[in-house]
Amino acid sequence: MKVEVVVEVRHTENKQKVIHALENIFTPKKIEEKRSDVGTVLIASCEGHECLEKLRSAIWRQGIQDAARSVIARGIVAEDTVVFSVNKQAAYAGVVSFVTEPNESPLGPITFTVKTSNTRQFLDWIAPRTYRGRVYYQAPPPD
């Protein structure tokens, strides 16, 4: 599994705070910076499910598996690709809040692109189905 995370650092934002927000929900192996019209774009990447453990833990801690599953499932864009976004300000506080509308996050979202050989297994691992508040089926981590 390969994960790429893209987040904008606007001219009015502190880059270290944006990196802190990113690292609250993701463990990158490397972070690249690119200049853009709005400031800087940070591109973080890693391989393996370990880098998404913070995001998964936050989803479980908040008890939002069903909501997360719904949003992430809508982000399946190809047989091997899932794209979803979370609110940058919420991530700074260590909370996961999914962004479903383009302008929902005024400072721009944190956008995840996950490439995996099995999108269903990824979905069942990061946000498993629940029944009456209990996990119905928990898949092993994807490749």
Curated annotation (Swiss-Prot):
One Pfam family in the UniProt entry: RNA_binding
The similarity comment for this entry is: Belongs to the UPF0201 family.
Which pairs are disulfide-linked? Answer: none
Q: What is the name listed in the Swiss-Prot or TrEMBL entry for this protein?
A: UPF0201 protein Pars_1985
**InterPro entries per the UniProt record, alphabetical:** PAB1135-like, Ribosomal_uL5_dom_sf
Q: Which domain of life is it from?
A: Archaea
